[in-house]
Amino acid sequence: RNNNAFSLDQYCISSKGQVKSVILVSKSNFRDIDTIFFDSRSKSSNLLMRVIAEKFFKINFEAKTYVPTRSMIFEPNAGYVVIGDLGLEISTSKMPGFKIYDLGEIWFNETGYPFTFASFNYVKTPSQDVINVLDSSFGRGIKSLEKILDYIKNINDINVSHKFIKEYLEKNIVYEFSKDHFSG
């Protein structure tokens, strides 16, 4: 813990319920999972998964780390944390025989609070110029959602519809910090 740390608590990447991009994929029911493969790309999502498994579902599991791919092979009685674009793709796909657990939704159902996946933190208080740039960027981003959606579809090799991405950015992701975020 850094006592000089500063958190810009106006903005975050969070969800109040279903997030769709942070999921656990398994062929098994949650309580039958004995191995969890943690996505090597995310510390916050893996910690969320650990809390859900240990505190809410009270399961014992072996922890492993992996890099998710579209062609991964799923072991029986194992759960796989998947984030980001691939998580969105899996959330929209119909994978017969698989269960998809949305970690943001589980957290919200268990606690009643949003889950914060990312926030802006600094080792020292940022200048007013930095804060102004973030404020301006946030405002422009919210007003330019259609341009951002087109950009995402053009640069990413993502197999998700424009409508789904729009709903994800507008309804599933919460960008502004609230009192509930501190409590959660």
Residue ranges and their predicted role:
Residues F6, N60-E62, K99:
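Conserved beta-strand segments of alpha/beta enzyme cores
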Residues T65-Y151:
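Pocket-lining segment of extracytoplasmic ligand-binding domains
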Residues P126-G184:
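Secondary-structure end/capping motifs
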